[in-house]
Amino acid sequence: MYFQSIVMNVADLDRSLEFYDEVFGFKLLARQDQLAAIHAPGSERPQVIVMRSLGTSSSRVGGAGHVGMRAFVLDCGSLNELERIATELDHRHSLVTRRDGDTWTAAFGRDPDRTAVVAGCSLDPDQSITLEAWAQLDEFLYGVAE
């Protein structure tokens, strides 16, 4: 089993498309009215985010206070890619913090709708973040959208 797609509601579709392109390199696959699909180019398997614009509303609450996605977590292919993402988040004043585990390092930020975005990377350049690393329940990760 692997990540194929997620669907997320956004307030401003254009703003979100720009953010996910410039920060993570996701490219537009399709767009129709207030719906868009973006993908991670270069991936061996399709990885798609489908975004639906809900528009702005003062009653809409972002982050962990709404039903929907709490955090979007990516495993970067290299420490250089992680540094590029962290720099872009910082440039946008969206970087919340950096965090290191025993076998990984990560940058925690927020997208334009205040959803938590996390880019992580294994400290071993020959492997992804392991299942064992996920078994070490890091309170910061699970509380990131609080």
Label for each model-derived stretch:
Residues D21-V23, I85-D90:
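Short amphipathic alpha-helices in soluble, non-transmembrane regions
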Residues Y2-A11, R60-E146:
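Vicinal oxygen chelate
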Residues K27-H66, G109-R110, T115-L123:
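Conserved short beta-strand elements that form part of the metal-binding/catalytic scaffold
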Residues S16-D21, R114:
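Conserved active-site tyrosine of GNAT-family acetyltransferases
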Residues M1-D14, E44, M69-F72, P125-E146:
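N-terminal beta-strand motif that seeds the catalytic metal site of vicinal oxygen chelate
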Residues V23-L29, S94:
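Conserved acetyl-CoA-binding loop of GNAT-fold acetyltransferases
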